């Protein structure tokens, strides 16, 4: 009898552990990043808010790892910042416009002054897009700091 109680207790415990990690995906916050086809679309977005741009490709392992980090930030700041994903394989002209050679490549444009983009770099603005790039897998902390800087500098 004691063995049956022990086995039953272990079985119930195993089932509880098995299902403890399951969650309902409908409660998870996910934010789809916008896609753009032209510089003009980016310019239109800049009229109302900073633009966070991630350049990547589905074939890139680091880009796949970057995606949930950016989606989490997009869910948090979507009402204050435009989040854009540009697939370099599909939009190679935009990748060339921003001199993208390595992916993922992330940068934030705070504003445009007389047609010149002002990128966020270390808490300040720069017109040098190369210096403002975050190339490779970038953790949430530096990305969030850059977003907050863009909002402050806007």
What are these regions (language model features)?
Residues 98-112:
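Structural micro-motif
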Residues 54-60:
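Aromatic-flanked redox-active Cys/Sec active sites in thiol-based oxidoreductases
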């Amino acid at each position: 009898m004691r063995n049956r109680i022990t086995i039953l207790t272990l079985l119930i415990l195993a089932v509880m552990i098995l299902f403890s990690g399951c969650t309902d995906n409908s409660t998870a916050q996910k934010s789809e990043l916008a896609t753009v086809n032209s510089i003009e679309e980016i310019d239109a977005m800049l009229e109302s808010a900073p633009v966070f741009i991630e350049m990547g490709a589905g074939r890139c392992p680091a880009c796949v790892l970057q995606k949930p980090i950016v989606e989490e930030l997009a869910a948090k700041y979507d009402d204050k910042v435009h989040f854009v994903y540009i697939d370099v394989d599909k939009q190679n002209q935009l990748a060339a416009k921003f001199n993208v050679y390595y992916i993922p490549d992330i940068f934030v444009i705070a504003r445009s002054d007389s047609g010149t983009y002002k990128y966020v770099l270390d808490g300040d603005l720069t017109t040098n897009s190369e210096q403002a790039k975050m190339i490779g897998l970038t953790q949430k902390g530096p990305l969030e700091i850059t977003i907050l800087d863009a909002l402050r500098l806007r």
